[in-house]
Amino acid sequence: MSTRAAKVLAERAIIESIYGLKVRSTEEVQDMVAANFSGKTESKTAATIRGIKIEEITYDSSKDIAKATASIVLDKFTNIDGQEMNLAGKLFRRVAFATSTPSQAGPVQAMRAAEIDAYKQLAKRVVGFTLESETTVENYILTSDVVKSKVLATMYLSEVTEYGWDSDGDAFVKMVLNVKDVGDILGLDVVNEEELIEVEGMGAQIDDFRQAQQD
């Protein structure tokens, strides 16, 4: 069961890399206190594709966690924005993890959270975001401070360069977008100060912000 699930999730990762996904995110901080932080990121994708190969599957029986590596080589493909991409035989490879034991799901769920956070960070860097701020000072004392940010974008052709977990079990995913390559693939003259945009997404097994609110 774990290996089958890992295969499907690896296929999803391939589709998100090539076809792309929609990312919607909101973040809010109140009164400059980290415990008052709230953030939510949602993603969505749907595409028809053929030719994905499962290169390798490994299974850790002690943790009931499976890892699947998927790859595909494509010449042309239409992305989420309806743009035809000339991929010229480019190889895409992604991995995914899954488990059939709920008690072991924490690490793999944290990894997915880190992946989505990386997509959000890329969207903020590439497309931009909207920020709203309201501050009130009464008699020289700060009485209210609210900052909100919003992101809504489609992302595609990003690549994962590194991933893993730290000693606390929190996950990280390093993701990169080669702006020049994207321009060449789309046949567009993309102007950007950075040719290579790199971000690192983070994912946790425990909601530290919610715990801080309860303390």
Set out the residue ranges of the language-model regions.
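Domain-level marker for long, solvent-exposed, non-transmembrane regions
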Residues: 1-215
